[in-house]
Regions:
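Aromatic-rich carbohydrate-binding modules that target alpha-glucans
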Residues: 386-411, 467-511, 521-536
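Hydrolase active-site cap/lid region
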Residues: 214-263, 319-323, 328-334
C-alpha cells in the first residue's frame, strides 16, 4: 500500500493536475496598459485658486480603444481635477476614480467633499473623471450603452472571439494610469515640482472600485487601495453564491444576464476572462495595504468576502456597512470618515490595529484583537422567508448590539439558527485614530443555515480497481469543463488514504442539470471511464442523480473505445513552437481537439467540426505560450483521450 501511494504521488507530481483557477498572474492587462499609444496627451484647461487651495484642470487623452469602425468613442478623454492645498505636506496623493459623461464641459468647480479631503489630509487629491468613457454606441447596435451594459457587451465579445483587447476593464485601468502619468508630468514640467506627487493611494466605488483593484495590481506607484462596493473577487465562486442564495440573478446584474455572460460559467472560456479581470488573479501584485468597504445590503453582491479575503496577502482590512445598498445611502458620511482615517494612516505611517477572526464550522465568529478597541459590536439580520438581505427589497433589517469579551481580547459572536428563513451576522470593531477620526473594521459575514436554498455541496466519489496505479478526476458542467482532481488521501471525504476511494467536494453547485465524466490518469494519458456521461440534478438545493461511480474493469470498459477512436502522441515532442498529432475517427461524429495547460485551463481549440470516418492529422502552433507541459485532448461523442506535449523554448 505504501508503494502504491508513493507511485500515485509521483504520478501526480509529474503531471501536476490542479484546480482550474489558480491565482497566478496574467500579462494581458499589463501589456495593454504599457502598449505605446500616440493618442496620449494632456493640456491644462484652466487653473483657479480659492482660500487655502489651488485647482488645476487637465484634459487627458489616454488612449485609442478599438477604432471608430467598432465604437463611436474610440479616443478616450478624461477631465482630471488636481486639488493642491496651500499646506501641502506629503508626496503621496489620493486618486479618486469617478465617472462622468462624454461631451461634458471642463469642470468649473470641485465637490466640497473632495476639497475637504485635500485640506484635511494636507495632500494632493486627484479626481480622474470619465472612467469609463460613456455612453457609447457600438457599430453593430443602434442604442447607447453605459456602465455594466458596456462591460457585459465587451465580455461577450471577448468570450466569443478571444480578442483580449475587448474587456472594458483594460481601457478603464489605462485611463487611470495615463491620468497619473499626466499629473506627474504636469507637476514636473509645468509647475517645476517633480517631488510633489511620487506615490498614489487609489479610491473608487463599484466599477471604479474594480478599477482600483486592477490599477493597483499593475502600477508600482500605487502604495495603498480603497475599493468600495466591489465585493466580487473570485468572481465565479462569488456569483455562484449569488445565484445559490436567490435562485435568480438580481436585477442589478441584469446587463450580464441579458448578454448571456452567466451562461458561460459552465465553460472553460470564463476562466480565461477571469485571468484578465478578476483581481484575485493578481494577488501576488496586491501586497500593498488594502481597505475594502462593502455594503451588507448591496443589490449587486451577496456578501462574498469569505471567498477571497483570506487569500489576500499583505495588510488588509474590510468593513461591511449595515443598512445600506450599493450607493451607501445615508451612511456615506460615516464611510468617508473610515476611508479618511485609513488614508491618513498611510500618509503618516501610523500603526494600524492588529486583529484576526475565524468563522467557525458551526457558523459562529471568533474575533481576537491585540489592539484595544473602542467598541466591538455584533450586527444581525433575519429574513424569515428567504435568503435576501438586499437593502432595496428588505429595508434596514440589520440590528446591532455590543459584544463583551469572552476572555482577554477575544469576542465570540454566535446566534441561533432561525426557525424559518435565514439569518446573517458579522462583528464590527472600532478603534481610535488621531482625533477626530476613528477606524471601523469588520469580519466576514456568516449565514445560518449554512446551506444555500438554491445550491448544494456535493461529494463526488469514485471507487477504483484493486491494483490500479493511476489517479482519477472529473470533468463536466459543474467544473466549467475543467479537469478537477479527486483525492485518495483520507482528507477529502474519501475515508482512508490509499483505500481506492477517490473523492472531491464541490461547494455551491447551483440549481440546474449537470453532466460529467470520470477520467483515469495513468501512464501520462487520460482515458474516460464511463460509456455515457454521468448526470445529476440540483433543484432547490437538493441533489438527485449520479454523484458516485464504481470502476468495474478499466481495461475492459475502454478497450473498444480506444480501438475505434484514437489520439496518437504528438511529434516532435518536446517541440518548439509547432508539433503534429494524428487521430482516428471510426463513425461520423462531431470531433473537438482542445489544448489545456498543466493547470487544466483551456488554451486553444484546434479541431471543432463534424468529421467522417478516417485518419486525420493536425498541427498545433505553441508560439506565444511559455514553456511547459500541455495536454492535447480529443473528444468525439462519449470518447475522450489526451496526450501530453512538452513545449521547450
Amino acid at each position: 500500500m505504501i508503494h502504491k501511494r508513493f507511485s500515485i504521488f509521483k504520478y501526480l507530481i509529474s503531471i501536476v493536475i490542479s484546480l482550474p483557477f489558480l491565482y497566478g498572474g496574467d500579462n494581458t492587462l499589463k501589456d495593454y496598459v504599457n502598449r505605446s499609444d500616440t493618442t496620449f496627451s494632456y493640456n491644462e484647461r484652466h487653473t483657479y485658486s480659492k482660500d487655502n487651495y489651488t485647482v488645476h484642470v487637465l484634459e487627458v487623452f489616454s488612449q485609442t480603444w478599438k477604432s471608430a469602425d467598432v465604437v463611436d468613442r474610440a479616443h478616450w478623454q478624461h477631465w482630471v481635477n488636481i486639488i493642491v492645498p496651500d499646506t501641502l505636506k506629503y508626496e503621496k496623493a489620493l486618486v479618486l476614480i469617478s465617472g462622468g459623461s462624454n461631451g461634458d464641459s471642463p469642470p468649473s468647480s470641485v465637490d466640497d467633499e473632495i476639497v475637504s479631503l485635500a485640506l484635511m489630509s494636507n495632500s494632493v487629491v486627484i479626481e480622474v473623471k470619465m472612467i469609463p468613457n460613456e455612453p457609447v454606441v457600438f457599430s453593430d447596435e443602434t442604442f447607447k450603452r453605459s456602465e455594466d451594459a458596456i462591460i457585459a457587451y465587451t465580455w461577450d465579445k471577448y468570450l466569443r472571439t478571444g480578442d483580449a483587447d475587448w474587456p472594458l476593464q483594460l481601457p478603464m485601468v489605462k485611463g487611470v494610469v495615463k491620468s497619473m502619468d499626466a499629473v506627474q508630468d504636469f507637476f514636473r514640467s509645468i509647475l517645476n515640482d517633480g517631488n510633489a506627487v511620487n506615490e498614489f493611494v487609489l479610491l473608487g466605488a463599484s466599477k471604479r472600485g474594480w478599477t482600483t483593484w486592477l490599477t493597483g495590481a499593475i502600477d508600482d506607484r500605487v502604495v495603498a487601495i480603497i475599493p468600495v462596493v466591489f465585493d466580487a473577487l473570485n468572481l465565479v465562486d462569488s456569483f455562484n453564491h449569488h445565484y445559490g442564495a436567490y435562485g435568480f440573478w438580481s436585477p442589478a446584474v441584469g446587463d450580464y444576464e441579458a448578454a448571456g455572460i452567466f451562461d458561460w460559467f459552465p465553460r472553460p472560456e470564463i476562466y480565461d476572462l477571469m485571468k484578465i479581470v478578476d483581481p484575485l488573479n493578481y494577488k501576488d501584485d496586491l501586497m500593498m495595504p488594502k481597505f475594502l468597504i462593502h455594503s451588507a445590503g448591496d443589490e449587486f453582491f451577496v456578501p462574498s468576502s469569505q471567498f477571497y479575503f483570506d487569500k489576500l496577502d499583505g495588510p488588509k482590512y474590510q468593513r461591511y456597512v449595515a443598512n445600506t445598498g450599493h450607493g451607501m445611502d445615508d451612511k456615506l458620511a460615516d464611510v468617508i470618515i473610515s476611508a479618511v482615517a485609513f488614508y491618513r494612516a498611510i500618509l503618516n505611517d501610523y500603526t494600524l490595529p492588529e486583529f484576526s477572526w475565524e468563522v467557525v464550522e458551526d457558523g459562529s465568529i471568533r474575533f481576537e484583537t491585540v489592539t484595544e478597541p473602542k467598541s466591538v459590536r455584533i450586527w444581525t439580520a433575519t429574513n424569515e422567508d428567504e435568503f435576501d438581505f438586499r437593502y432595496y427589497t428588505m429595508g434596514p433589517i440589520w440590528k446591532d448590539s455590543l459584544l463583551t469579551e469572552s476572555e482577554s481580547g477575544v469576542y465570540i459572536a454566535n446566534i441561533s439558527e432561525p426557525l424559518s428563513g435565514y439569518s446573517a451576522f458579522f462583528i464590527e470593531a472600532s478603534y481610535n485614530s488621531v482625533y477626530p477620526y476613528y477606524y471601523t473594521f469588520s469580519t466576514d459575514v456568516s449565514f445560518l443555515p449554512k446551506q444555500l436554498p438554491h445550491a448544494a455541496t456535493i461529494s463526488f466519489q469514485v471507487m477504483g480497481v484493486s491494483g490500479n496505479e493511476g489517479a482519477f478526476s472529473i470533468q463536466g458542467d459543474m467544473t466549467s469543463q475543467m479537469i478537477r482532481e479527486l483525492f485518495d488521501d483520507g482528507q477529502h471525504d474519501d475515508q482512508e488514504a490509499g483505500d481506492g476511494l477517490w473523492a472531491l467536494t464541490l461547494k455551491n453547485v447551483i440549481d440546474g442539470e449537470y453532466k460529467y465524466n470520470v477520467i483515469l490518469h495513468e501512464n501520462d494519458t487520460m482515458v474516460k471511464q464511463n460509456d455515457v456521461p454521468l448526470s445529476f440534478l440540483v433543484q432547490n438545493g437538493h441533489v438527485s442523480g449520479t454523484t458516485s461511480y464504481l470502476i468495474g474493469s478499466v481495461g475492459t470498459i475502454n478497450e473498444g473505445v480506444v480501438e475505434n477512436f484514437n489520439l496518437s502522441p504528438a511529434y516532435p515532442n518536446p517541440f518548439n513552437p509547432r508539433t503534429t498529432f494524428k487521430y482516428s475517427v471510426k463513425t461520423q461524429n462531431h470531433v473537438s481537439v482542445n489544448i489545456y495547460d498543466i493547470n487544466g485551463n483551456w488554451i486553444n481549440t484546434i479541431v471543432n467540426k463534424m468529421q467522417h470516418p478516417g485518419h486525420y492529422e493536425a498541427q498545433w502552433d505553441g508560439s506565444g505560450l511559455s514553456s511547459g507541459i500541455y495536454f492535447i485532448t480529443m473528444v468525439s461523442g462519449d470518447f475522450i483521450q489526451s496526450q501530453k506535449a512538452l513545449l521547450l523554448k
